Design a protein with these regions (language model features):
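Short glycine-/acidic-enriched loop or helix-start segments at secondary-structure transitions
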Residues: 20, 43, 92, 122-124, ...
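FAD-binding core/adjacent interface of flavoenzyme oxidoreductases
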Residues: 1-11, 66-152
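Rossmann-like dinucleotide/flavin-binding elements
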Residues: 5, 11-32, 117-184
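Predominant activation on well-ordered alpha-helical scaffold segments within soluble catalytic domains
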Residues: 22, 68-71, 109, 135-139, ...
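A Rossmann-like FAD-binding core segment of flavoenzymes
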Residues: 71-91, 95, 170-220
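Ligand-binding pocket scaffold of soluble enzyme catalytic domains
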Residues: 17, 103-105, 207
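Conserved N-terminal glycine-rich FAD pyrophosphate-binding loop of Rossmann-like flavoproteins
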Residues: 37-61, 189-192, 199
Length: 220
């Protein structure tokens, strides 16, 4: 099997992976970033809304704009990107990589795993029915593939992610019946909640989802 040597190998070209690559490159390291997708930026490409926060932390920019900015900065620092590349295991010989149909081992002095986050979810009767999905999946369908996840939907969770996704589904043409929150208060920013209320979407606190009903997909 072919072997390659690299100083630093980062697995994942999302916001964490690119940021790590930039900092390492600024310190003088030779950095290679591998990602299974064909674009750099990871979840940032799902984020079509403008970010809040400090000006030096990309406030006022949309996620895909942040991704492009980070990509440009990384490439200017000499960071090498391997896209459409799968890292399938870390062994004593090195990191197993499949790239462009070739299987090889990368021997790196340092390996940073930034393979992405996992969304929290709530299990309930019917939660495995087709039509029940996490926020990230809904964003991927609507914002990347331009496919509406559903015509009528309920969003569970009133944190910033839930509120933003609910509004994005409205923008995409879905009917958002409600946002439900188990706590006694809304978890996200008031500006996001107010935007939904203005659009006629009720937000119910102290409310839990009991079940999703349907035989082959969600019907209620």
């Amino acid at each position: 099997m072919k072997e390659l040597e690299r100083e630093i190998l980062i697995i994942g070209a999302g916001p964490a992976g690119i940021s790590a690559a930039i900092e390492a490159a600024k310190a003088g390291a030779k950095v290679t970033v591998a990602d299974e997708h064909d674009t750099i930026g990871g979840q940032l490409y799902k984020q079509i809304h403008k970010f809040f926060g400090a000006a030096d932390n990309h406030a006022g920019m949309r996620g895909f704009e942040i991704a492009r900015k980070l990509e440009q900065e990384a490439k200017e620092l000499g960071v090498e990107f391997w896209l459409n590349t799968v890292a399938y295991g870390i062994f004593k010989e090195g990191v197993g990589i499949v790239r462009d149909g070739d299987n090889f081992i990368v021997k790196a002095k340092k390996v940073i795993v930034a393979a992405g986050g996992i969304e929290n979810t709530t299990a309930f009767p019917g939660s495995t029915l087709p039509g029940v999905m996490l926020a990230g999946a809904a964003q991927t369908m609507a914002n990347i593939h331009r496919v509406l996840p559903g015509k009528r939907m309920v969003v569970v969770g009133s944190g910033n992610v839930g509120l933003i996704v609910a509004y994005q589904m409205l923008q995409a043409g879905a009917e958002v019946l409600a946002v439900v929150e188990r706590d006694d208060h809304i978890g996200g920013y008031g500006v996001h909640a107010e935007r939904l209320r203005t659009a006629g979407v009720p937000i119910f606190t102290d409310t839990v989802i009991k079940c999703a009903s349907g035989k082959t997909s969600v019907e209620g």
